[in-house]
């Protein structure tokens, strides 16, 4: 079993429960909402939607064979089944999970790596380093982006056509956003259950080889701020480094900002805040977590784009999830270590203390010249800063709160929108846990443990 991911407001959790079966669980109260077979969502499924014809149940593979992205509390689910072969891995299905019916299916020229969506846009990342952006109301292709192209101009002539039926059915489902809310009130039983997980994986396979997966993250609000990692070298350069970030307005289809070399190595994981103003990044090493201003607000030009910097730990870790809460005051970091870290982003004392531009620009001047221009104490401060700027920072701020986990348990987390001080933890040992985040520095308190069936 694999826990795939929470929906955008953490009201539901989608689980790949084995052999092409997807199950949607309500988080509060905890319980099963829907289950259906991925390969039979076109209406030809049996009564309970369960079938076993491709994946091995209980697969121990770290990377799930299924991508599933749920649209808030609606009945819309975007699904990619890579377990049926190469051709199915190139197809995106938009399904109605309540009716177990296929709304539309889109075939792409290459394997699908990731899918993200909100109420306005759905974005699809392919393994040929292209991003397809769709209007979710009618599934019209709005733009294509190339991770190698400097101008990021899409080719609308290569769009994939979807019929009127898709547009009408999607609009109908978007209007029925309270379907799961009604079911949620009935799901306060069935708490006896088992699970597993997947975060979005570190690498993906192409013809047996592995490469770092480009990152794709979309803001939860209707502004649809899309942030994606981009190669900092030319396509001919074998040393492919994914450490540049493009901030893109997916609603108005125009680039907003370009963040250059956010880490020394490849960017392994990203997350954008709900309002699209902040972007969190982690590299392959996973010891440093950085928060950047995306530049979507008018105040970004008044200061550096690097907003906050945290030390997760001294040992390297594969980070597979970063997530902001709804107010962007907390950032959770999940890796393959035995601790889940929660950082505070709203403490002014944590802001980076940059070097003054006018003093720093005098680095080529003589000591005597500097003494004549600024007082003695400022001279000392100047040299302290210059020396410090060339020494790795060993005193970065650490987590505000944490959760101790079994190291072997792969985990996905969610911040429930309706509970400010809670966090959900779904793990591949079959547990679903609810924790309270402390008001002061310390360990999160376990409130409740449930189990996936």
Swiss-Prot record:
**Which Gene Ontology terms of cellular component type are present?**
cytosol; endosome; fungal-type vacuole membrane; phagophore assembly site
Gene Ontology biological process terms in this record: autophagy of mitochondrion; cytoplasm to vacuole targeting by the Cvt pathway; piecemeal microautophagy of the nucleus; protein localization to phagophore assembly site; vesicle organization
Kindly state which keywords UniProt assigns to this record, in alphabetical order: Autophagy, Cytoplasm, Membrane, Protein transport, Repeat, Transport, Vacuole, WD repeat
**From start to end residue, where is composition biased (Low complexity)?**
187-198
| Primary localization | cytoplasm
Sequence motif: L/FRRG motif, positions: 310-314
Q: Which GO terms describe its molecular function?
A: phosphatidylinositol-3,5-bisphosphate binding; phosphatidylinositol-3-phosphate binding; phosphatidylinositol-4-phosphate binding
- Which compartment or compartments is the protein found in? Cytoplasm; Membrane; Vacuole membrane
- Keyword field contains Magnesium: no
Any one Pfam family match given in the protein's UniProt record, by short name: PROPPIN
Q: Where is this region: Disordered?
A: 177-207
Name of the molecule in the record? Autophagy-related protein 21
Q: Which organism is it from?
A: Candida glabrata (strain ATCC 2001 / BCRC 20586 / JCM 3761 / NBRC 0622 / NRRL Y-65 / CBS 138)
């Amino acid at each position: 079993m694999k826990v795939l991911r929470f929906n955008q407001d953490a009201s539901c959790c989608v689980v790949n429960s084995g052999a092409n079966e997807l199950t949607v669980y309500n988080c509060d109260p905890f319980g099963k909402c829907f289950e259906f077979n991925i390969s039979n969502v076109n209406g030809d499924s049996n009564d309970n939607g369960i079938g076993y014809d491709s994946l091995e149940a209980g697969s121990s593979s770290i990377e799930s064979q299924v991508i599933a992205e749920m649209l808030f509390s609606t009945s819309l689910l975007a699904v990619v089944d890579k377990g049926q072969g190469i051709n199915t891995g190139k197809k995106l299905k938009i399904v109605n999970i309540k009716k177990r019916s296929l709304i539309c299916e889109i075939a792409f020229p290459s394997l699908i790596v990731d899918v993200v969506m909100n109420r306005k846009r759905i974005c699809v990342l392919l393994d040929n380093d292209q991003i397809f952006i769709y209007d979710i109301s009618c599934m019209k292709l709005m733009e294509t982006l190339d991770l190698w192209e400097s101008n990021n101009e899409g080719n609308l002539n290569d769009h994939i056509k979807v019929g009127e039926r898709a547009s009408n059915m999607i609009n109908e489902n978007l209007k029925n956003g309270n379907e799961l809310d009604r079911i949620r009130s009935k799901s306060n039983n069935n708490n006896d259950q088992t699970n597993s997980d997947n975060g979005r994986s570190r690498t993906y396979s192409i013809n047996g080889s592995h490469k770092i997966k480009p990152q794709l993250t979309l803001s939860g609000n209707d502004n649809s701020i899309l942030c994606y990692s981009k190669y900092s070298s030319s396509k001919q350069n074998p040393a492919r480094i994914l450490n540049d970030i493009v901030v893109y307005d997916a609603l108005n289809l125009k680039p907003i900002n370009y963040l250059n070399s956010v880490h020394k190595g490849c960017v392994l994981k990203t997350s954008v805040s709900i309002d699209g103003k902040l972007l969190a990044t982690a590299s392959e090493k996973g010891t440093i977590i950085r928060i950047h201003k995306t530049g979507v607000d008018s105040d970004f030009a008044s200061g550096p784009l690097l907003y906050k910097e945290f030390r997760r730990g001294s040992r390297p870790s594969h980070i597979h999830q970063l997530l902001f809460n709804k107010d962007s005051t907390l950032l959770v970091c999940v890796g393959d270590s035995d601790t889940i870290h929660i950082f505070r982003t709203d403490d002014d004392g944590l802001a980076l203390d940059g070097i003054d531009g006018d003093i720093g620009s005098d680095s080529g001047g003589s000591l005597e010249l500097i003494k004549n221009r600024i007082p003695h104490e400022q001279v000392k401060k100047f040299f302290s800063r210059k020396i410090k700027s060339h020494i790795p920072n060993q005193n970065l701020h650490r987590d505000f709160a944490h959760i101790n986990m079994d190291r072997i348990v792969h985990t996905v987390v969610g911040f429930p929108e309706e509970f400010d001080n809670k966090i959900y933890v779904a793990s591949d040992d079959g547990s679903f846990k609810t924790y309270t985040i402390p008001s002061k520095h310390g360990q999160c308190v376990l409130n409740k443990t449930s189990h996936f069936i």
